[in-house]
Amino acid sequence: YITPDEFNKVGNQVQQGIFEKYMSDLNQQLRIPENDNEYANRVKNLEEKLDIFKTIAEPTFSVDHFTTASLPNFYRLGTVIYNDTIEAQMVERNEWYKIKRAPLLAPTKKQPVFLYEDTKISVYPTSITSDIQVSYLKQPAMINWGYSVGSLGQYIYDSSSSVNFELHPSEQVDVVTGILLYSGVIIQDPTIIQVASQKIQQEDINEKS
């Protein structure tokens, strides 16, 4: 068997792998010409799975920029909103240089822009130092099989310190299969590894067919 600590490590690795696969799968689907209902359903299904991780929060302002480092479990930036209603436009550094050279294109509080580099969100005009909210994808919370150790050395489940998986319910089979695969590696059971690997390969084929 594997210990609760080993389960937690494996569970978090499996959950993170499934979560990050959403990104690559969605990018792949968005590159396919939109020509049938099957395409739309695949994109819709992926977006539904990502909805769990979409959130809104206020980033911290420091000196001359806002920072995503202050956002809980931050993974990927979505939109930047000023004063609850105005969506700022993201620009690249080379675009910003062009804007600076053209007074008629200067950003205003009604039409703000922002640069996003590393964890920094630089909003223009620079008079905007508050009232900024961002939508973003957050990382899944770290799962935890909470437990205490009994008098005989047995593990006793503790629901008060446990954290469940945050993935969509449809991922249950993939979670179990992934945990079985890693568990087989930990306990060095080639049969479990083989069965779990075949199951994962078949799931990948089914998703792409």
What are these regions (language model features)?
Residues 1-209:
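Glycine-enriched, solvent-exposed interface loops adjoining structured elements
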